[in-house]
């Protein structure tokens, strides 16, 4: 039978893992290997994908992929991974004690003043970025779904200016399956850091040590940060740190990154191993007696054959050998082997496969997990089921239930929009508007009393205060929206949304993982585009990038709020929600079009770990809100301020630089009149409206500041309700800001960026025209 045929609660032992290529390798790296025992936890509300437990953690898998995995039913899972009933409470040695790994004066110390460079490497969602913040004093964003870090981040260890530490994207192995794995692997191989800090989730140690073993093979000085030890001990578990050090041959430091416990000791070990270049004491993890020694002999024979090539290419020999056996094409290409050498290696691997009874990739994965099992059996007392896990199961019965998941998601999103636009955000906005209005009146009075020049007076009041002030008044709405998005992300709910939305997204040609960048897109398109780097398929990544501009970003909120309050005051929440919904609908429509034209084929398999629900940290939420508020304020007082002053100048002077009494005679009117015919069919033939939309290409918030300057509070007399609706739809769909286009250019290239800009404007024009025509027919 296959894994697909198992029911909820049933357990089985894996016999064979079908499939081929990078995806199959990814399954093996995640622990889906022959002999592994799995239990089906649940199915998504739409019946696909499934959630299963393997090696002590939860993994999602599509039914189509599960159909390629043959299993045999077992009555219950074995308890061989529980480890000893009790371990000794020997104190963990400090730096230099016992002489195991830090013998004073040993090694070949680096010259004084040479920069110590570190790679911070670990699985996704293991607390890596939290540790980076503790080590460097940075405030990088921390989340509770796989793939928060999508690019490398650099910093110096506090009080050690001669150090440089790089926070790399979270990975499960050194196999090049996803973009983040390629980024992390290339950094370690090409940049050759002086040392590696490998962060391991102590609550999920079996899965995490799989990556650790590959890092040890790279023969780079390394220290292991055993994170979340507080959670292990709180749930009656324990780990013999001294013994695990001896088995792995590197220093192991128990820490809690979230509570900043053990971090100082970790820093001392990290500085020492980098300074003295103390390399791992062990790289050979296959016993020569295991399964007849087939894998052991193969690795050593291949290592001998490629030794000269590996040294010449600068690739660690042991790492290169295991990767070649796995079938890693990138490593094979780097070594430049001749045909005779390739044939000899292939002969060795085929012989090993016959003796071992497993294919090459499965044999290497099994070798690693066998060693990990031996370590855990002798050093780890499994914690009882944690409070977090029990709580997560209870919450999931509702939030990911068969009949409740989709309704709960809709209710949650509606509640977010209602509280943002009608209650909390709107209330705070009103207070800020009163403050800005009072400050404007006070400044106006002071300038008048001082007899300030009329031009300067107009610039300050009509340009800066009226323009920038109108944008600033929308800060509470933006902060409120990000507050709720942050709660959803930190709690782990967004990962669940990806799980139960996968089947729905697959119908439009995407994977459930694409939901994460799209949800981020409701905040800002720039990080949403960057977040697509976590997608394993280039096809999915490109398609998701092209769809993110349809998700209405927070920078458009001031436009919506401005026109909704002016033209639809009694139906604000409904109109706002309708705009967001329209953006999603148009995005889905174009997803179907892209699937049939530019991106034919099926979406890649959905393989994702589901983290436990966690209470969002107040510090992390406040930090995120401050970052977003700071970004908004910086934009308001740079790009928007400059744009506002420029608009004021152009609408106050004619082509001879004489001040005009009627803005119709201004430079701005002359420029904007060129594009007025384009917008006239939309009911937007006023040159001032055209000008505001052009300024929105720089920053969407500029639309409101430009309107305030040009109309001076009389916009309701210049537009009809239908024209306002047409303008709202155009603003929703037209080209994203310069920063977003720049991020698309960085990810896809200039041609794609220009295409996105032109296509979005064309889509917006057509949609606004349809609104206009339908409105006229109904009137």
Predicted stretch roles:
Residues 223, 233-383:
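Alpha-helical transmembrane helix bundles of large polytopic membrane transport and channel proteins
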Residues 92-173:
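Conserved G1/Walker A P-loop phosphate-binding module
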Residues 355, 362-366, 382, 426-464, ...:
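Extended, low-charge hydrophobic alpha-helical regions
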Residues 550, 554-577, 739-749, 768-779:
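Transmembrane helix-loop junctions at the membrane interface of multipass transporters and ion channels
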Residues 398-499:
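Core alpha-helical transmembrane segments of integral membrane proteins
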Residues 408-419, 481-486, 564-566, 580-593, ...:
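Hydrophobic core segments of alpha-helical transmembrane domains in multi-pass membrane transport
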Residues 160, 185-252, 559:
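Conserved C-terminal guanine-recognition region of P-loop GTPase G domains, centered on the G4
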Residues 434-442, 495-525, 600-624, 668-670:
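Juxtamembrane inter-helical linkers in multi-pass membrane proteins
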């Amino acid at each position: 039978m296959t894994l697909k045929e198992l029911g909820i609660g049933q357990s089985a032992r894996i016999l064979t893992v079908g499939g081929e290529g990078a995806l199959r390798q990814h399954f093996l790296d995640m622990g889906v290997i022959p002999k592994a025992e799995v239990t089906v936890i649940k199915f998504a509300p739409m019946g696909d994908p499934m959630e299963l437990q393997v090696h002590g953690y939860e993994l999602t898998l599509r039914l189509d992929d599960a159909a390629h995995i043959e299993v045999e039913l077992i009555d219950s899972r074995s308890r061989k991974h529980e480890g000893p009933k009790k371990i000794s409470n020997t104190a963990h040695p400090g730096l230099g004690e016992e002489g195991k790994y830090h013998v004073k004066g040993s090694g070949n110390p680096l010259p004084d003043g040479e920069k110590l460079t570190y790679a911070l490497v670990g699985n996704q969602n293991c607390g890596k970025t939290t540790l980076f913040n503790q080590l460097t004093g940075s405030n990088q964003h921390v989340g509770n779904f796989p793939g928060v870090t999508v690019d490398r981040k650099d910093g110096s260890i506090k009080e050690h200016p001669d150090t440089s530490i790089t926070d790399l994207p979270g990975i499960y192995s050194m196999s090049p399956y996803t973009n983040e794995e390629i980024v992390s692997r290339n950094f370690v191989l090409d940049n050759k850091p002086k040392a590696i800090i490998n962060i391991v989730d102590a609550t999920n140690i079996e899965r995490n040590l799989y990556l650790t073993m590959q890092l040890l093979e790279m023969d780079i000085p390394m220290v292991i940060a055993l994170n979340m030890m507080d959670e292990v001990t709180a749930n009656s578990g324990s780990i013999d740190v001294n013994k695990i050090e001896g088995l792995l041959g590197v220093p192991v430091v128990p820490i809690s990154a979230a509570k900043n416990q053990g971090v100082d000791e970790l820093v001392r070990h990290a500085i020492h191993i980098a300074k003295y270049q103390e390399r791992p004491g062990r790289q050979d993890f296959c016993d020569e007696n295991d399964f007849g020694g087939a894998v052991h002999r193969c690795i050593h024979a291949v290592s001998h054959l490629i030794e000269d090539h590996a040294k010449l290419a600068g690739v660690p020999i042991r790492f290169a050998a295991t990767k070649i056996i796995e079938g890693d094409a990138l490593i094979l290409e780097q070594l430049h082997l001749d045909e005779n050498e390739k044939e000899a290696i292939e002969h060795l691997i085929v012989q090993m496969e016959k003796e071992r009874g497993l294919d090459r990739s499965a044999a290497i994965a099994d070798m690693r997990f066998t060693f990990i099992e031996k370590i855990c059996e002798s050093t780890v007392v499994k914690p009882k089921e944690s409070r977090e896990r029990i709580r997560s199961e209870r919450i999931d019965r509702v939030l990911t239930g068969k009949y409740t998941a989709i309704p709960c998601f809709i209710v949650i999103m509606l509640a977010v929009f209602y509280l943002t636009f009608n209650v909390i955000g709107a209330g705070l906005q009103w207070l800020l508007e009163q403050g800005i209005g009072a400050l404007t009146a006070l400044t106006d009075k002071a300038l008048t009393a001082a007899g300030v020049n009329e031009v300067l007076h107009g610039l300050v009041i009509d340009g800066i205060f009226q323009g920038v002030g109108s944008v600033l008044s929308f800060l509470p709405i933006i902060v409120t929206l990000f507050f709720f998005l942050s709660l959803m992300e930190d709690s782990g709910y967004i990962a669940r949304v990806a799980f139960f939305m996968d089947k729905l997204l697959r119908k439009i040609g995407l994977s459930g993982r694409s939901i994460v960048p799209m949800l981020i897109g409701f905040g800002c398109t720039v990080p949403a585009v960057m977040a697509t780097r976590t997608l394993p398929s280039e096809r999915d990544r490109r398609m998701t990038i092209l769809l993110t501009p349809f998700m209405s970003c927070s920078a458009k909120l001031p436009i919506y709020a401005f026109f909704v309050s002016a033209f639809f005051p009694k139906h604000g929440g409904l109109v706002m929600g309708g705009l967001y919904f329209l953006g999603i609908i148009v995005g889905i429509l174009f997803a179907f079009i892209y699937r049939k034209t530019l991106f034919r084929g099926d979406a890649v398999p959905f393989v994702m770990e589901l983290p436990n629900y966690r209470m969002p940290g107040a510090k992390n939420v406040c930090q995120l809100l401050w970052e977003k508020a700071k970004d908004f304020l910086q934009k308001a007082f740079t790009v928007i301020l400059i744009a506002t002053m420029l608009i004021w100048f152009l609408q106050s002077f004619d082509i001879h630089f004489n001040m005009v009494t009627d803005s119709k005679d201004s430079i701005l009117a002359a420029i904007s009149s060129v594009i007025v015919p384009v917008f006239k069919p939309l009911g937007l033939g006023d040159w001032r409206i055209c000008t505001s939309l052009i300024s929105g290409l720089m920053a969407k918030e500029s639309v409101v500041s430009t309107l305030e300057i040009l109309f001076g509070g009389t916009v309701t007399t210049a537009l009809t309700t239908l024209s306002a609706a047409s303008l709202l739809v155009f603003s929703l769909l037209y080209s994203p800001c310069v920063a977003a286009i720049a991020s698309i250019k960085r990810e896809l290239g200039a041609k794609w960026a220009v295409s996105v800009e032109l296509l979005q404007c064309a889509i917006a024009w057509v949609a606004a025209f349809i609104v206009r025509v339908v409105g006229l027919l109904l009137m």
